From Swiss-Prot:
UniProt entry tagged with the keyword Nucleotide-binding: yes
Assembly notes: Tetramer of two alpha and two beta subunits.
Pfam family of the protein (one): Phe_tRNA-synt_N
Name of the protein described by the UniProt record: Phenylalanine--tRNA ligase alpha subunit
EC number assigned by the record: 6.1.1.20
Subcellular location as annotated: Cytoplasm
Length: 344
């Protein structure tokens, strides 16, 4: 068999292998075996020196044609295999839009968070700013500078969480007011929302709960201003027809001090189990800032007056949404939260 026949035989052999190849790796092997530097076609061409010039030209042209055709065949088969691989990948990852969707349970805003946001927005609309502070607090800011003496019951280990280094978990957000007055000079109008901690746990109390306190300090601030602000707030939360009353009370950091009640939201003031037959619900504490507190933060009580108030967010949420057990607010049960979805 001559060189021409050998080349044509290699051509047919290579084209058959290319046609049968099932992956790109096999095509690469064919390229190396037939077209590589040590491939079969190259081996045949090494014998061209034994031929006459006319035969070398003819065989050379034939070899070049075969190489070009094999390269083209390899290219086409490579593109075909890549296309098939892509189609297979798309087939495997195809989304069947006829399948019923997987149910994804959606959450909803927690009633405490909803209430906190609502209350904050009411006071912000009246010109108050939001102030924040640390939850791990110094006794100095939590008690001493708020005119709470060392022998006060609130400072007992039965009521306060004390840490090993002498710090405490804040029992109210009043320390934020102290820090604000130390940092800023009057006029001051801030609310301080956040988590607070007390050793108490029953259906109406939690060792951790949310509180929001307010402080306004300026010249000529009166108790009438305090009553007006709280009236706007309570009517915004519970409705324009809400009955409100102020009762004299005592807090170490305010003087005079008052407790604020609203007409029972359950019985309408007629008397029920929730209001214990009184027709009233205790809602918050308030008062005029004690001069001793002003002195502790370097504000002249002869020049400035101010008022402060504080309330529990959980308390407001329970009254607004008629929740009977505070522990329900901390279960993390989505079924409970979803009851309040879309309710404001």
């Amino acid at each position: 068999m001559g060189l021409k026949e050998d080349l044509k035989a290699l051509e047919e052999e290579a084209k058959k292998l290319i046609e049968e190849a099932s992956d790109i790796g096999k095509l690469n092997d064919i390229r190396v075996n037939y077209l590589g530097k040590k491939g079969k076609i190259k081996s045949i061409l090494k014998t061209l020196g034994k031929l006459s010039p006319e035969e070398r030209k003819e065989i050379g042209q034939l070899a070049n044609r075969i190489k070009d055709e094999l390269e083209e065949a390899l290219k086409e088969k490579t593109e075909l295999l890549k296309k098939k691989a892509l189609e297979e990948e798309l087939r495997k990852n195809r989304i069947d839009i006829t399948l019923p969707p997987q149910w994804i349970e959606s959450g909803s805003s927690h009633p405490v968070i909803s209430t906190l946001i609502e209350i904050s927005q009411i006071f912000i609309s009246m010109g108050f700013s939001v102030a924040e502070g640390p939850e791990v607090e110094k006794e100095k800011y939590n008690f001493d500078m708020l005119n709470i003496p060392p022998d006060h019951p609130a400072r007992d280990m039965q009521d306060t969480f004390f840490l090993n280094n002498g710090d405490i978990l804040r029992t109210h957000t009043s320390p934020v007011q102290i820090r604000t007055m130390l940092k800023h000079k009057p006029p001051i109008a801030v609310i301080a929302p956040g988590r607070v901690y007390r050793k108490d746990a029953d259906p109406t109390h939690s060792p951790m709960f949310h509180q929001i306190e307010g402080l306004l300090v300026d010249r000529d601030v009166t108790f009438r201003d305090l009553k007006g602000i709280l009236k706007i707030f309570l009517e915004s939360v519970f409705g324009k027809d809400t009955k409100i009353r102020f009762r004299p009370s005592y807090f170490p950091f305010t003087e005079p001090s008052a407790e604020v009640d609203i007409g029972c939201t359950v019985c309408g003031g007629k008397g029920c189990r929730v209001c214990k037959g009184t027709g009233w619900l205790e809602i918050l504490g308030c008062g005029m800032v004690d001069p001793e507190v002003f002195k502790a933060v370097g504000i002249d009580p002869e020049e400035y007056t101010g008022f402060a108030f504080g309330l529990g967010i959980e308390r407001i949420a329970m009254l607004k949404y008629r929740i009977t057990d505070i522990r329900l607010l901390f279960t993390g049960d989505m079924r409970f939260n979803q009851q309040f979805k879309g309710i404001r």
